[in-house]
From Swiss-Prot:
Function according to Swiss-Prot or TrEMBL: Core subunit of the mitochondrial membrane respiratory chain NADH dehydrogenase (Complex I) which catalyzes electron transfer from NADH through the respiratory chain, using ubiquinone as an electron acceptor. Essential for the catalytic activity and assembly of complex I.
E.C. no: 7.1.1.2
GO biological process, one term: mitochondrial respiratory chain complex I assembly
Membrane association type: Multi-pass membrane protein
Name of the protein: NADH-ubiquinone oxidoreductase chain 2
TM annotation in the entry: 13-33, 60-80, 96-116, 124-144, 150-170, 200-220, 241-261, 278-298, 325-345
Provenance organism: Papio hamadryas
Pfam families with a match to the protein in the record: NADH_dehy_S2_C, Proton_antipo_M
Signal sequence residues: none
Keywords in alphabetical order: Electron transport, Membrane, Mitochondrion, Mitochondrion inner membrane, NAD, Respiratory chain, Translocase, Transmembrane, Transmembrane helix, Transport, Ubiquinone
Family as reported in the entry's similarity comment: Belongs to the complex I subunit 2 family.
UniProt subunit comment: Core subunit of respiratory chain NADH dehydrogenase (Complex I) which is composed of 45 different subunits. Interacts with TMEM242.
Localization (cell): Mitochondrion inner membrane
UniProt keyword Cytoplasm, yes or no: no
Amino acid sequence: MNPLAQLIIYTTVITGTLITMLSSHWFLAWAGLEMNMLAFIPTLIKKTNARSTEAATKYFLAQSTASMILMMAIISNNLLSGHWTTTTNYTNQFPPLAMTIALTMKLGMAPFHFWVPEVTQGTPLTSGLLLLTWQKLAPISIMYQIHPSINTHILLILSTLSIAVGSWGGLNQTQLRKILGYSSITHTGWMMMTLTYNPTITTLYLITYITLTTTMFLTLNLNSSTTTLTLSNTWNKSTHLMPLMTSTLLSLGGLPPLTGFLPKWVTIQELTMNNNFIIPTIMITMTLLNLYFYMRLIYTISLTLLPTSNNTKMTWQFENTKPTLFIPALITISTLLLPISPLILSIP
């Protein structure tokens, strides 16, 4: 891709997200979402092939459908209340319900999740990273603004369904991008679980999730790993990354005493304080499934070499020219922040 075109595209993606996050007017928020969506599509088809074109088409159809529902909700709210502000008190339950459906569709939450694994699988690792991290910021910022009017029961149902679908869907997958796509569905469910109770916990979970996912994608990009077969050659390509990738995967699964355990612990604590006991039990059970397929990846990295017909053509250690500047810092943050969790939680 032309560097100038790439600069314009990424600038528009960032600008669209910032317009949505900083806007209190519904039309500007919607326009920011559209700018972000239309500018992001070219990043999905950097490599022109049938799979990337299919992924971009699925992304466009899902996002445009959600945008239409959101615009319908915005117009309905204006007709009913006469206001265009995002923080208005909603007198009718229909606009916030339609907004919730539209924004959860944009986030890829169940039952509107079908596009997430397919789009993630059909894109390069860098585009998949942006899809599962940066592209969540704008919809979540809108949900943050309207959270007092969101129906708590509906959001809890959608979040629980997302956790279950993401955990079950990740089983028996061999494509790493699909596994991370299903993992994203699960983590989005965890994020949204406490939005109506305590949005600060949602923010904490979002920051932790973005850090862990960025670390994982950058590590996979460094090794050029997209399947469990290529992942099994990690010990040959980057021996020093084996324990670091292992700890990142365990943190992504929420295993103590790693960083990923902190937001899960706080989320469960918040739900139990609000007398929700069945939902945290389901969440913990589903997290065990998540941890299972992360452990399967760890087993692949550290202990085995998958059956292949060309074992003699191994990829040996060559000098890696890809930038590794941020990976050590990100891995440190991804694994070692739990001891300072009281300090993190004390920040208002």
